[in-house]
């Protein structure tokens, strides 16, 4: 056995259909595409979602929902994070600038304070864009002050 004498096993290689090589080949003329119509033309490819003239699924189903253009997104900050910030900095006023300096929020973020974490006592004024009802209650009960921005 030599490399130049190697052949594939019998029946393992299928001969390809030679289409459009004259009428004598058996596959000439219309080249297995039938007569006329879009599918017989060169460059034809079916449209994605085309269902043969039936109204396609993406057009049968209704549109729904929208995204409001003027939605205000708040960055949630929890009380336990604020307590850590107070311990770390020792500040008596916690505002957005201080939160930004310590990496809690971005420069243009609006802040909403949420009530996760236990609060024993807060001797600080917390300034934010919004507070949850339970967070503002927890802060005032612990001796802190709540101030809303605009």
Curated annotation (Swiss-Prot):
GO cellular component, one term: cytosolic large ribosomal subunit
UniProt biased composition (Gly residues): 21-31
Entry-linked Pfam families: Ribosomal_L27A
Region (Disordered) location: 1-51
Highest taxon listed in the record's lineage: Bacteria
InterPro entries: Ribosomal_uL15, Ribosomal_uL15/eL18, Ribosomal_uL15/eL18_sf, Ribosomal_uL15_bac-type
GO biological process: translation
Keywords: Ribonucleoprotein, Ribosomal protein, RNA-binding, rRNA-binding
Molecular-function GO terms, alphabetical: rRNA binding; structural constituent of ribosome
Segments passing through the bilayer: none
Family to which the UniProt record says this protein belongs: Belongs to the universal ribosomal protein uL15 family.
Record text on subunit structure and interactions: Part of the 50S ribosomal subunit.
Alphabetized HAMAP family for the sequence: Ribosomal_uL15
Described function: Binds to the 23S rRNA.
Protein name: Large ribosomal subunit protein uL15
Organism (species): Cytophaga hutchinsonii (strain ATCC 33406 / DSM 1761 / CIP 103989 / NBRC 15051 / NCIMB 9469 / D465)
Phylogenetic classification of the source organism: Bacteria, Pseudomonadati, Bacteroidota, Cytophagia, Cytophagales
